[in-house]
Curated annotation (Swiss-Prot):
Its EC number is 1.1.1.79, 1.1.1.n11. It comes from Arabidopsis thaliana (Mouse-ear cress). It is found in: Cytoplasm, Cytosol. This is Glyoxylate/succinic semialdehyde reductase 1. The keyword Acetylation applies. The gene is GLYR1. Belongs to the HIBADH-related family. NP60 subfamily. One of its GO terms (biological process) is response to oxidative stress. Follows a sequentially ordered Bi-Bi catalytic mechanism involving the complexation of NADPH to the enzyme before glyoxylate or SSA, and the release of NADP(+) before glycolate or gamma-hydroxybutyrate, respectively. Although GLYR1 acts as an aldo/keto reductase, it has no significant homology with either mammalian and bacterial NADPH-dependent SSA reductases. Keywords: Acetylation, Cytoplasm, NAD, NADP, Oxidoreductase, Stress response. Catalyzes the NADPH-dependent reduction of glyoxylate to glycolate as well as succinic semialdehyde (SSA) to gamma-hydroxybutyrate in vitro. May function in redox homeostasis and play a role in oxidative stress tolerance by detoxifying glyoxylate and SSA generated in glycolate metabolism and GABA metabolism, respectively. GO terms for cellular component: cytosol. The ratio of NADPH/NADP(+) may regulate enzymatic activity.
């Protein structure tokens, strides 16, 4: 199976590498073309524009940083729309809002192409291990045709119906994750300021009902003030903002998420946006100094 892949950031690079390792022919594009070099060493082909990738491949996957990037790749000069046509499938796995997905869907289908949104739950390590959770919506036939690729990229794929539902589900998942991370950060800081061992707190949490992979995986490095970026904080804050907008649309009160968003915004103002989202703990520390 031959696929195109647009966007080689932390997630896109790991995902496209998995496709290559599992026998897929992969043609890649990235705005900074030098990021394609390692994938070329593993057998990927490179195109100089998204349009060229679409022209070459029946199926093209995109994994981009935000709604602006997702729209740019589709609508700008040399973009997806220049070559999308009947028989072509476009799978956008970026985390965007439902409005952005709907706009892309309308443009793709208006040219005769087929569209699936497929945002993922999971960060760098699950992407490298092929253990993402795929939250797909849109063209059902294209979803089913994409299963061989999805099975390489993730441990389970959900089909959620019409376009927009995948985006909404992803934002809700990330809103919960961000709120949990902020509460977790407050707990670690509170333990430390109370004269208790935050490492002991991790052990206690791991033995009880609140045990989870995020606390177990992030806690030790947070206690060492180390935040290698698996999921950049700036993207977590973007998702919190979009989730709060979804709450506004549906008249859902979300004070916990709103407070967490403020902490992530504070962390960004401290210059921590490119670090892992667990660096939000530094904003919690700052607020208590």
């Amino acid at each position: 199976m031959e696929v195109g892949f647009l966007g080689l950031g932390i997630m896109g690079k790991a995902m496209s590498m998995n496709l290559l390792k599992n026998g897929f022919k992969v043609t890649v594009w990235n705005r900074t073309l030098s990021k394609c070099d390692e994938l070329v060493e593993h057998g990927a082909s490179v195109c100089e524009s998204p349009a060229e990738v679409i022209k070459k491949c029946k199926y093209t996957i995109a994994m981009l940083s935000d709604p602006c990037a997702a729209l740019s790749v589709v609508f700008d000069k040399g973009g997806v729309l220049e070559q999308i046509c009947e028989g072509k499938g476009y799978i956008d796995m970026s985390t965007v809002d439902a409005e952005t997905s709907l706009k892309i869907n309308e443009a793709i289908t208006g040219k005769g192409g087929r569209f699936v949104e497929g945002p993922v739950s999971g960060s760098k390590k699950p992407a490298e291990d092929g253990q993402l959770i795929i939250l797909a919506a849109g063209d059902k036939a294209l979803f089913e045709e994409s299963i061989p690729a999805f099975d390489v990229l993730g441990k389970r794929s959900f089909y959620l119906g019409q376009v927009g539902n995948g985006a909404k589900m992803k934002l809700i998942v990330n809103m919960i994750m961000g709120s949990m991370m902020n509460a977790f950060s407050e707990g670690l800081v509170l333990a430390d300021k109370s004269g208790l061992s935050s490492d002991t707190l991790l052990d206690i949490l791991d033995l009880g009902a609140m045990t989870n992979p995020m606390f177990k995986g992030k806690g030790p490095s947070m206690n060492k003030s180390s935040y290698p970026p698996a999921f950049p904080l700036k993207h977590q804050q973007k998702d919190m903002r979009l989730a709060l907008a979804l709450g506004d649309e549906n008249a859902v009160s979300m004070p916990v998420a709103a407070a967490a968003n403020e902490a992530f915004k504070k962390a960004r103002s401290l210059g921590l946006g490119d670090l892992d989202f667990s660096a939000v703990i530094e904003a919690v520390k700052f607020s208590r100094e």
